[in-house]
Amino acid sequence: MPGGRISHIEFPADDMERAKRFYRAVAGWEPEPMEGFDDIEFFQTAHEEGGAIGRRGVGTGQVVRAYITVPSLETSLAAVEEHGGSVIEGATELPGMGRFAVVLDSEGSEVALWEDVAPAG
């Protein structure tokens, strides 16, 4: 059974316009703003994965952050602590989208765990 997929990745930027120009030229990504999100713009790849470029420490964290989709945020957060990691930002809900938390893995790398919102009905 495959494990959690990388749902998206965030790139922190000190200069948003410079970073957007860089990723447009290098990767062909077209970051676009999304209503309700300041200091961060989102892009989609040709393979449907996506990501974001955000103002460092405001729209994103301080380092590149991968988001791993998990079936249960609570179960995964418990596993983080049981296996030598730590939670640095508890569960945060993005209404209509899902929930995420930011953790340090057993080696000190920062990753985020993402749980999709349950389908209506």
What are these regions, as identified by a protein language model?
Residues 29-62, 106, 110-116:
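Conserved short beta-strand elements that form part of the metal-binding/catalytic scaffold
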Residues 1-20, 48, 64-66, 116-121:
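N-terminal beta-strand motif that seeds the catalytic metal site of vicinal oxygen chelate
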Residues 8, 42, 52, 90, ...:
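Conserved beta-strand positions that form and line the central face of beta-propeller blades
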Residues 8-44:
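N-terminal first-folded block
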Residues 10, 30-36, 89-94, 117-121:
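Conserved catalytic-core motifs of GNAT/GCN5-like acyltransferases
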